[in-house]
């Protein structure tokens, strides 16, 4: 009787052991795939990015001086979803992607300043005060940064509305969180941050105020270029003698993306579609005003969600920064800039592709199914199938 009980216990033990082994294998595979796709893949992608090299020696006559280099990151169109649009899973997935991408970039690349070129939120143009507060809280969690790293944000049409939707309340609400700063100088470099939604030129109150601010900035920049102590400039502190970098959401006027190229440019079928002024790009008049007032050496913009490089007047380069979110692009990226008071160099850093991550997950699911069926004996292994075929041939 005792022998029968021992045999019965052994008979139950082996299936239990097989099930435990299967469960451990499944957990190990799931953990490994999640670890790679949700954490390690960002390190693998961003580790390949390097700060571009820039000349750091400036010459004033025959004297040479060493210029400091500012390491700046430029990203655009994060479009954090609000309470109305987008499925909760869509919101969770895309916001996690952006959070991991930024936190990994901050840790690996150690930038000194991060600029976001508008459309931080997707529903800022109509969100309630409660929804706005929730969106801001999520943004601050996702885009947290060390105290020595500065974060600068310009307004986009999804943050404060298109021109016909924009009002003082929305603008002040945005500027209360992200500052109303128009001119930012660091390491001898001037950055001008423009509310391009307010550059409609129709004389609206917000537009007139924005233009007046830019005229004042233009005056200060001109004073920095003139001889020190000029009567026209007054006794106030002068800006560094450096042509500014213009940062805004809308691109300066261009007819279309027909001359844009690259993996992250607009799809070929969309490149020849004409742009609408004050909707897709700034108007000709507003663009000419900005170029005349500010005389920038470099322009960076967002809005189109795709990359493009154009030259205005044959001398002022503008780079449209692609969207940072998987929701707008399969291959998001950001721009890295090494900038000095007299020179700059830019390079692009690509984030993991969403389709690659999905393929890895699909492959993992297929592997788990095969592994489970194999353990349950419902799927013969290739080795056993080969042995059976050999036996059949020998018997013939």
Curated annotation (Swiss-Prot):
InterPro entries: Calcineurin-like_PHP_ApaH, Metallo-depent_PP-like, MPP_MPPE1, PGAP5/Cdc1/Ted1. Its cofactor is Mn(2+). A divalent metal cation 1 binds at residues 119, 157, 249, 303. Its EC number is 3.1.-.-. It comes from Macaca fascicularis (Crab-eating macaque). It is a multi-pass membrane protein. GO terms for molecular function: GPI-mannose ethanolamine phosphate phosphodiesterase activity; manganese ion binding. Belongs to the metallophosphoesterase superfamily. MPPE1 family. Metallophosphoesterase that catalyzes the removal of a side-chain ethanolamine-phosphate (EtNP) from the second mannose of the GPI-anchor protein intermediate. Participates in the glycan remodeling steps of GPI-anchor maturation to allow an efficient transport of GPI-anchor proteins from the endoplasmic reticulum to the Golgi. It is found in: Endoplasmic reticulum-Golgi intermediate compartment membrane. Keywords: ER-Golgi transport, GPI-anchor biosynthesis, Hydrolase, Manganese, Membrane, Metal-binding, Transmembrane, Transmembrane helix, Transport. The chain crosses the membrane at residues 27-47, 356-376. It is an enzyme of class 3 (hydrolase). CDD domains: MPP_MPPE1 (cd08165). The keyword Transport applies. This is Metallophosphoesterase 1. GO terms for biological process: endoplasmic reticulum to Golgi vesicle-mediated transport; GPI anchor biosynthetic process. Its main location: endoplasmic reticulum. A motif (Di-lysine motif) lies at residues 392-396. A divalent metal cation 2 binds at residues 77, 119, 249, 305. Binds 2 manganese ions per subunit. GO terms for cellular component: endoplasmic reticulum exit site; endoplasmic reticulum-Golgi intermediate compartment membrane; Golgi apparatus.
